[in-house]
Amino acid sequence: MAKDFGVQEITDDLQPSFNVAPTDNVAVVLNNGVKQLVAMRWGLVPFWATDPKLASKHINARAETLTLKPAFKDAFKRRRCLVVADGFFEWQKQGATKIPLFIHLEPERPFGFAGLYEIWTPPLGEKLVTCTIITTEPNELVRPIHDRMPVILPKDAEDFWLDSAVEDHMRLLDLLQPYQASDMSAFTVSKLVNSVKNNSPECIQPVSAMGQPPLF
């Protein structure tokens, strides 16, 4: 993973996770003069917050309102990051049933969601470093499944996004587009992912590999 993003320092012990839930730790790349791979809690707590429970409301940030929302506008200017993943889950309605899908790049490889991070310092205790994932309109693959999708940054845009010296906010906003659908794919996975208690490689295996019929 470090090689995929040109990381120079790994500051935390990062363990694989196959079913990430809000408030879990996620792997994040940032650039503070040195490109680092760190762990952050998913769910952004604004620096001005009085209660860290706000994190549950801020797991995602809409690209269209980043410069307007108090929770995100300062982080957008100064604290941009990549949230590392190799796919994400969405649930497709089929009658009264919701079918879990794992959506990934084709061929499968790690990528970075466009993210923001914050450092929250309570009156007492240790600082809390949290992040959010930016969403945008869905592409042709995701549109039948959900009305939003996370922003996946192309490789050639990652360094520009991470550069805190960049002040051209319009160019930054222009990066927050749906990823090319032809370079993505999806497959049905087990309903194990419906419970955050389940966090094993089986969560991201195609159901056909587990002896179940595929959806498509």
Q: Can you say where each PLM-predicted feature lies in the sequence?
A:
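Short linear sequence motif anchored by a di-proline
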Residues: 1-216
